[in-house]
C-alpha cells in the first residue's frame, strides 16, 4: 500500500477551502446585507445555502459549488470573475 504522503494534498485538506470568502463578505457588507438575507435570496433561486454555511464560506472553512457561486454573484450583483480579482 502506498502511503498518503506520496499523493498531492487535496484542496480540502488545507485550512483555506475556497478563494472567494473574503470577497463574498466584503461585497455582502458593502450592500449592507446580512448573511441570513443572502441565504434567503439564494433560496428564491432554488440554491439552498443556510446562514451558517454562508458564515463558513466567508471564513473559508467551506467549499463553494459552481451553482452557489453563480447565485452569490447574482444576488450580490457582481460578475463571477470579480471574485477572483485581487
Protein language model annotation of sequence segments:
Residues 20, 31, 47, 62-65:
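Flexible coil/turn residues that form the inter-helical turn or adjacent wing/linker of helix-turn-helix
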Residues 29, 43-44, 59, 70:
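Residue-level detection of the helix-turn-helix DNA-binding "recognition helix"
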Residues 52, 59-71:
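Short, basic-rich loop-to-helix N-cap that marks the start of a DNA-contacting helix
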Residues 66-70, 74-86:
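Short C-terminal boundary/hinge segments that cap the last helix of small helical domains
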Residues 23, 34, 38, 65-68, ...:
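Residues that mark the N-terminal boundary/hinge immediately upstream of a DNA-recognition element
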Residues 32-56:
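Short alpha-helical DNA-recognition segment
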Residues 2-31:
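A short, Lys/Arg-rich alpha-helix, primarily the initiator
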Residues 24, 28, 38, 54, ...:
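Hydrophobic packing within well-folded, soluble alpha/beta domains
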Amino acid at each position: 500500500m502506498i502511503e498518503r504522503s506520496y499523493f498531492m494534498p487535496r484542496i480540502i485538506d488545507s485550512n483555506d477551502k475556497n478563494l472567494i470568502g473574503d470577497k463574498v463578505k466584503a461585497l455582502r457588507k458593502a450592500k449592507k446585507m446580512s448573511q441570513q438575507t443572502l441565504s434567503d435570496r439564494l433560496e428564491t433561486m432554488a440554491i439552498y445555502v443556510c446562514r451558517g454555511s454562508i458564515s463558513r464560506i466567508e471564513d473559508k472553512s467551506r467549499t463553494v459549488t459552481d451553482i452557489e457561486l453563480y447565485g452569490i454573484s447574482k444576488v450580490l450583483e457582481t460578475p463571477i470573475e470579480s471574485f477572483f480579482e485581487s
